[in-house]
């Protein structure tokens, strides 16, 4: 599913991150990036203090611009650091803004290719995973948790499974059931 493109694991780096910044289409659900970026640039041009930048990052929508606030590089709009997957089973909620309650939500988000936006990382494309494959991938992710957290991990998997059975806000039913190809809505402009 191309997860290892960003969540790299090796003997020297067993936590599963490339330590880079990517726009994976999370912030795009909430923001008009260009307008927000222009507002941020106006504020940054006034040489805002470190305290003011911290306040903006913590208390305003400017935080959704991600790395751009630091670099001012448009290619960094909406880009956030790749999180590690070690112990991912016990670290909910997920994504930079905590907007995804379960690992099912995370995989559903990636399965449909994130939220389209002009700054979306080029590696983020629909995955075309079936429901069974989504469930298998989630189960695999729970295996990445250290044995010291085994009890918490089992309880969290059960909790997330129950939540996912009730509500899957990021799931695309047509893609998951393979009624449409995952790229069809983007290619045709139809939903």
Where are these regions (language model features)?
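C-terminal soluble interaction/assembly domains
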Residues: 114-129, 136
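Solvent-exposed, acidic/flexible segments
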Residues: 78, 100, 127-130, 134
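Short glycine/threonine-rich turn/loop motifs
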Residues: 1-100, 105-108, 115-118, 152-191
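Short acidic/polar inter-strand loop motif in beta-rich domains
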Residues: 145-148
């Amino acid at each position: 599913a191309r997860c290892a493109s960003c969540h790299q694991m090796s003997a020297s780096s067993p936590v599963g991150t490339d330590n880079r910044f990517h726009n994976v289409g999370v912030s795009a659900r909430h923001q008009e990036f260009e307008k927000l970026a222009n507002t941020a640039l106006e504020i940054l041009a006034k040489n805002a203090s470190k305290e003011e930048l911290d306040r903006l990052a913590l208390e305003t929508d400017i935080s959704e611009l991600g790395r751009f606030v630091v670099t001012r590089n448009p290619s960094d709009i909406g880009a956030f650091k790749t999180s590690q997957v070690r112990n991912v089973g016990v670290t909910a909620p997920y994504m930079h803004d905590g907007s995804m309650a379960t690992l099912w939500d995370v995989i559903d988000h990636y399965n449909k290719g994130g939220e389209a936006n002009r700054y979306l990382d080029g590696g983020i494309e629909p995955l075309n995973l079936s429901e069974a494959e989504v469930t298998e991938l989630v189960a695999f992710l729970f295996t990445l948790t250290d044995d010291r957290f085994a009890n918490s991990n089992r309880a969290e998997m059960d909790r997330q499974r129950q939540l996912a059975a009730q509500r899957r806000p990021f799931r695309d039913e047509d893609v998951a059931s393979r009624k449409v190809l995952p790229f069809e809505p983007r290619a045709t402009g139809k939903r």
